[in-house]
Amino acid sequence: MPGVANSGPSTSSRETANPCSRKKVHFGSIHDAVRAGDVKQLSEIVCLHWLLWHGADITHVTTRGWTASHIAAIRGQDACVQALIMNGANLTAQDDRGCTPLHLAATHGHSFTLQIMLRSGVDPSVTDKREWRPVHYAAFHGRLGCLQLLVKWGCSIEDVDYNGNLPVHLAAMEGHLHCFKFLVSRMSSATQVLKAFNDNGENVLDLAQRFFKQNILQFIQGAEYEGKDLEDQETLAFPGHVAAFKGDLGMLKKLVEDGVININERADNGSTPMHKAAGQGHIECLQWLIKMGADSNITNKAGERPSDVAKRFAHLAAVKLLEELQKYDIDDENEIDENDVKYFIRHGVEGSTDAKDDLCLSDLDKTDARRPSKNCRASWSMNDYVEKN
């Protein structure tokens, strides 16, 4: 139990020569029970639950100030975390650096453990002694899954630490490109990334240069952020892309239906409105674009289709929608039904001047459509008569 000097398993718990005659392992503290690890071990040797049932002190701390919850968060022991929460463990307890179990789960990339703690109602924006929040730790250590989860749970990515660093500064400093891209996409404006300086007067470009993070530098230079107000420029040149990016379906409909933009219009980087909507996970915009016949197989300059962009930003519903559409397109191209008139409408030659609607006209419509042709023949006969006389 807590407070026992020798916290390791007792010598009497060692296995004998006969593998069938094993003795139970007795742990000196709840910390050793959590260190034991996976769920099978926990159930087989009756450790954590046994200690909890017998009144083990879940507030006991190590020399670093770690409680059992801290160790479970570090090791990603989901079952341990659940058991500790059910027994009233304090998830706001701070260690010597001011870190809570939430900070440590984000540091070590245990997103499922992190989600269990978030569901218990713990504050996701708690700070340590350096004013780092869990999002700062996730960005600094390149834990994209944890970072996305924390943002989904409402954590702000515009909170600064004691040095004025945003999470995007920390991602740039450590060269975590995927986290950097995700944070850039979630900032309130594209230019805010370069305009944000920490207390040392450094922005993301300065930090990437100082720590020789070439991948971050190449991304910034390739995207041409420096010295340009991309938001204003894009709003003027590609209003449809901006509407799709913001999820403004009403504006997008108006622009397309009024003929202001083409539904597959491509921006300077080769992206279409569907790319923009997919990158932000705007399902309603995507559904409307698909209904209007937007091409989901167009790639941008990075070689990404809309489904690839949705994958990059972890919008799973958008990925599913677009991949099902692409699967349908592939099957549709392989199966030709000569008796299906609508097949030829869907697969009409691009730029053809033929009226594809004529294929589905009723008999009355076809009769009406031939009337102008009769008038033309009558006028030709009259012209011939005039020329002869």
From Swiss-Prot:
Pfam families, per the entry: Ank_2
Molecular function GO terms recorded: cyclin-dependent protein serine/threonine kinase inhibitor activity; NF-kappaB binding
Disulfide pairings: none
Keyword Repeat carried by entry: yes
Extent of the ANK repeats: 25-60, 64-93, 97-126, 130-159, 163-192, 200-232, 235-265, 269-298, 302-332
Region annotation Disordered: where it falls in the sequence: 1-21
Domain of life: Eukaryota
Xref: InterPro entries: Ank_Repeat/CDKN_Inhibitor, Ankyrin_rpt, Ankyrin_rpt-contain_sf, EF_Hand_1_Ca_BS
Record-given protein name: Ankyrin repeat domain-containing protein 42
